[in-house]
């Protein structure tokens, strides 16, 4: 395989670390939490966190037996947040409970569950973190209908680790965040496993997991059923002034993605993204399968990506690699633009052992005239779709690739592309 060495390096680099067991237990009820679903337990939960964090070895903050209504809480180093099975940490519906703050270099709101410059953090227990975001979704829809652009940070995110180290989420359900649900931001050594991430399929910007300028990340055995990207690897915002750090050394494996926009790299990629492995992924009814997306105002080096052992059922577009986001394919003639700091460069990408049935479109692979997609390899790929695959401004190798289209050609290659078939 072309990128065998890469796969080994990524898998080793992203292996979870083990930290010392915490020594103190802080039950939030002992600090005054009611867990009745109507009393705001924010202060009691935060006091339990702060008390455990002050202990020499940190501790376990326990929530069990009820629905704990809360505004934003802040985790501290060496804390395990244990939300027991059958227990819900529910976000306050009152927008005033979420302080405005600088979030991701811009104006925003404090996340529902957050941590900043902390390490050795675990969220586990089998319970639910519910962002209760419907009122925020409704407001966002009204703004859109009114023609208001709105900010990327105009709603609080769900669970955010900001400049943290050694983070684990295991055995949880995370759902209904106002926007982006789990976000490691400039965070190193992250494991998210055996977790469900859920939201109404029509909810705006409810990405399941967004590793943002983060490194050594494992996402495994996750079920995502949301209203936006099931996973979106990001680095840097639109028109970022820089500098931006890349997202790299990321493994996504043994996951199932239902509603949502698929497994995405981008679109915000001003810091780049490298060394990403996605394997044994099942897509059912997602808008897209594999999606690598950017454009001239948010790109950088995006390379050494491996997608293997992929199954898709009724996915609208199986493979979408485009440097024209939000468009999939340019309209009419495209002129080259000067190469700048935010020009996207997609290269060294392999898609192997992919089977897709019931797609509307097999795919698109298209780069910019000044930055074509280079060294993209499709191997052992079988796609059945209503329409075929288009390739332009790209250098591609197709090795045992079959695209069966009901309408038109299976694969259409533009004169701007170089395709080698094997």
Question: Whereabouts are the PLM-identified features?
Answer:
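Extracellular/periplasmic carbohydrate-active domains that bind, remodel
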Residues: 17-422
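Bacterial N-terminal signal peptides
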Residues: 4-14
């Amino acid at each position: 395989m072309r990128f065998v060495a890469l796969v080994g390096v990524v898998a080793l680099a992203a292996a979870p670390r083990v930290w010392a067991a915490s020594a103190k237990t802080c039950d939030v009820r002992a600090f005054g939490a009611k867990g009745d679903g109507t009393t705001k337990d924010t202060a009691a939960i935060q006091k339990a966190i702060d008390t455990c964090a002050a202990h020499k070895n940190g501790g376990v903050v326990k929530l069990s037996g009820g629905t704990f209504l809360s505004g934003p809480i802040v985790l501290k180093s060496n804390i395990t947040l244990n939300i027991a099975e059958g227990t819900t940490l529910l976000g306050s519906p009152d927008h005033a409970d979420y302080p405005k703050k600088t979030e991701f270099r811009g104006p925003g709101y404090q996340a529902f569950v957050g941590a900043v410059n902390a390490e050795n953090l675990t969220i586990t227990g089998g319970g639910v973190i519910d962002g209760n975001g419907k009122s925020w979704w409704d407001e966002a829809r009204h703004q859109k209908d009114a023609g208001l652009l709105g900010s990327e940070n105009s709603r609080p995110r769900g669970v955010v680790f900001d400049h943290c180290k050694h983070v684990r989420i295991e055995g949880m359900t995370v759902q209904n965040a106002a926007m982006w649900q789990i976000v490691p931001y400039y965070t190193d050594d992250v494991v998210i496993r055996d977790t469900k991430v859920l939201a109404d399929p029509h909810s705006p910007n409810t990405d399941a997991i967004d590793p943002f300028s983060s490194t050594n990340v494992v996402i495994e055995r996750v079920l995502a059923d949301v209203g936006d990207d099931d996973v979106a690897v990001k680095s840097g915002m639109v028109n970022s002034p820089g500098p931006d750090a890349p997202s790299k050394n990321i493994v996504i494996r043994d996951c199932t993605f239902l509603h949502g926009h698929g497994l995405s790299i981008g679109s915000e990629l001003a810091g780049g993204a490298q060394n990403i492995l996605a394997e044994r992924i099942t897509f059912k009814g997602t808008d897209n399968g594999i999606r690598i997306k950017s454009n001239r105002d948010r790109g950088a080096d995006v390379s050494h990506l491996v997608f293997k052992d992929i199954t898709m059922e009724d996915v609208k577009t199986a493979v979408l690699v485009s440097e024209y986001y939000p468009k999939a394919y340019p309209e009419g003639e495209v002129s080259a633009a000067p190469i700048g700091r935010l020009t996207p460069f997609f290269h060294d990408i392999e898609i192997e052992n992919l089977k897709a049935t019931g797609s509307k479109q097999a795919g698109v692979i298209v780069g910019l005239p000044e930055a074509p997609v280079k060294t993209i390899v499709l191997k052992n790929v079988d796609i059945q779709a209503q329409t075929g695959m288009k390739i332009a401004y790209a250098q591609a190798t197709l090795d045992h690739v079959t695209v069966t289209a009901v309408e038109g050609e299976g694969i259409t290659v533009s004169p701007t592309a170089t395709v080698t078939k094997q």
